[in-house]
């Protein structure tokens, strides 16, 4: 067994992050929700034993370990596939809306949701904290990059919300600097330098549309924002409990990661590169001439 592990270490050392990503992705319970620490028994302090074993060619292989490693090898190699190209600068996370990286992800969610549900989908939202890679550099875009960016098994879900609920949703998006695609937002920083929603319109077929508080809109979010139990406003987590009051809640049977991989592949097949999209979906009212 030790020899098999040694051979595994030598053979996949350079691809170990990819292997760990695949193992993590294979765990159905993995999500952004924090795991509870194991219960501690009072006074329990078992003794520790340390030993050293030299792993070299003198130790025979273990067929079970060899078979396990061989099963992952094709998927590890698949992560090195180039699925697209980033051109025009790096994709970076930062600031309100999670920067151009947040725009890239929510643009992809909105595009893929419309492939499934049609153009009636008007808005896509995800949290900035779920984007676990700060930069995707200009150049070749690997499948591994998307796994590193989106390591969680978060599923996309359709929510049918009233216009009033959409505005409440966007208040949380703005105040916690989360990412969205489909809305044009004006915000203003409060005394604590926290951005607050001032106004919002939807961008439908290239035209700005006022949000009708009584109308019904299709919105796509990740299930994490819907299912998590912590709803108190904090510096890192917004209160998305409004999603529980949707008129309709319907899973898309698609994870956020698969949606973005599909999106990149579609863009590549159409001859388009992924470009940093620093558009005006978030505009400061102060910068636009308002007062603070």
Give short role names for the model-derived ranges.
Residues 32-292:
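Catalytic centers of hydrolytic enzymes
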């Amino acid at each position: 067994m030790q020899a098999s592990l040694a051979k595994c270490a030598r053979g996949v050392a350079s691809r170990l992050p990819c292997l760990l990503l695949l193992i993590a992705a294979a765990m159905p319970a993995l999500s952004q929700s924090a795991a509870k620490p194991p219960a501690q028994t009072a006074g329990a302090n078992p003794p520790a034993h340390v030993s050293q074993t030299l792993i070299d060619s003198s130790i025979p292989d273990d067929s079970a370990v060899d078979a396990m490693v061989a099963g992952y090898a094709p998927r590890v190699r698949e992560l090195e596939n180039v699925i697209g190209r980033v051109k025009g600068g790096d994709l970076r996370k930062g600031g309100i809306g999670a920067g151009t990286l947040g725009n890239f992800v929510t643009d992809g969610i909105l595009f893929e949701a419309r492939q499934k549900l049609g153009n009636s989908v008007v808005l896509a939202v995800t949290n900035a904290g779920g984007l676990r890679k700060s930069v995707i550099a200009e150049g070749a875009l690997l499948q591994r990059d998307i796994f590193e960016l989106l390591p969680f098994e978060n599923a996309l879900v359709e929510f049918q919300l009233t216009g009033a609920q959409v505005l409440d949703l966007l208040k949380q998006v703005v105040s916690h600097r989360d990412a969205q695609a489909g809305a044009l937002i004006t915000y203003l920083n409060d005394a604590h330098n926290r951005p607050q929603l001032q106004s919002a319109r939807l961008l439908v077929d290239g035209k700005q549309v006022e949000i009708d508080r009584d109308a019904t809109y299709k919105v796509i979010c990740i299930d994490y924002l819907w299912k998590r139990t912590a709803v108190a406003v904090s510096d890192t987590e917004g209160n998305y409990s409004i999603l529980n009051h949707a008129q309709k809640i319907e899973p898309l049977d698609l994870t956020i990661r698969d949606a973005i991989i599909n999106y990149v592949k579609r863009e590549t097949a159409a001859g388009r590169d992924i470009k940093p999209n620093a558009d005006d979906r978030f505009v400061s009212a102060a910068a636009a001439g308002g007062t603070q």
